[in-house]
């Protein structure tokens, strides 16, 4: 009974979060002055952290052909990520993967109802799980593939390409404090957990 009440509170809060983020994204997207050679002018954030919604939306509009499909590895609760704008505002289908079972359970309850073509999967992503992702993905050529797992990203990205994935737009988080001139990565670690490593 207590879990049902807790879920009801979370679900109500999440509905409001979605509405607020969608409204914010629409307002920000309408107020942009787009300069084709300045990616900063493409930015807006409804669901993303740093303007990715706008950049992805701008690039998506430039695709000559699209399949309305995304893959998000590191999807969290399905609301705060790089592809939620595509799901809620652009009617995309897709695959959302996260290693945290509590977050994927919340996403399953809230986000899955917005698209019959959305699959939410609880999976701790490692280099060895790429074949599983390949098996459950509807295509190897999604319009957008977003990778944000806060560790092992480089090695996961490398393995995705080795498995044949060819996204039209590929979004990978990086740590900007090292600057664009440096090529730095961690030692691959299949047990890497951002909750314990990023304290």
Positions of the model-derived regions?
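Short, flexible coil/linker elements and helix-boundary hinge sites characteristic
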Residues: 1, 8-12, 115, 141, ...
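Short charge-dense sequence patches
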Residues: 2-11, 35-37, 53-58, 150-160
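Short, functional N-terminal and low-complexity linear motifs
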Residues: 19-27, 71-76, 122, 170-174
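Membrane-proximal basic amphipathic "stem/tether" segments
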Residues: 1-43
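Conserved acidic-Pro-Pro-aromatic motif
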Residues: 72, 85, 92-93, 140-145, ...
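N-terminal, active-site-proximal structural segment of metallo-dependent hydrolase catalytic domains
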Residues: 28, 47, 74, 181-182
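Context-gated lysine
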Residues: 3-6, 21-24, 62, 131-134, ...
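SAM cofactor-binding core of SAM-dependent methyltransferases
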Residues: 40-136, 140-142, 147, 176
């Amino acid at each position: 009974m207590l879990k049902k009440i807790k879920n009801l509170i979370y679900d109500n809060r999440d509905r409001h979060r979605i509405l607020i983020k969608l409204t914010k994204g629409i307002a920000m997207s309408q107020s942009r002055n787009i300069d084709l050679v300045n990616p900063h002018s493409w930015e807006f954030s409804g669901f993303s952290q740093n303007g990715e919604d706008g950049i992805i939306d701008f690039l998506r509009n430039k695709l000559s052909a699209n399949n309305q499909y995304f893959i998000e590895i590191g999807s969290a609760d399905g609301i705060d990520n790089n592809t939620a704008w595509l799901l809620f505002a652009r009617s995309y289908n897709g695959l959302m993967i996260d290693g945290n079972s509590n977050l994927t359970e919340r996403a399953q309850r809230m986000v899955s109802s917005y698209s019959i073509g959305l699959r939410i999967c609880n999976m701790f992503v490692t280099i060895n799980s790429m074949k599983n992702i390949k098996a459950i993905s509807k295509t190897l050529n999604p319009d957008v593939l977003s990778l944000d797992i806060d560790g092992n990203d480089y090695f996961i990205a490398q393995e995705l390409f080795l498995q044949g994935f060819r996204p039209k737009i590929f979004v990978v988080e990086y740590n900007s404090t090292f600057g664009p001139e440096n090529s730095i990565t961690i030692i691959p670690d299949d047990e890497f957990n951002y909750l314990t490593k990023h304290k």
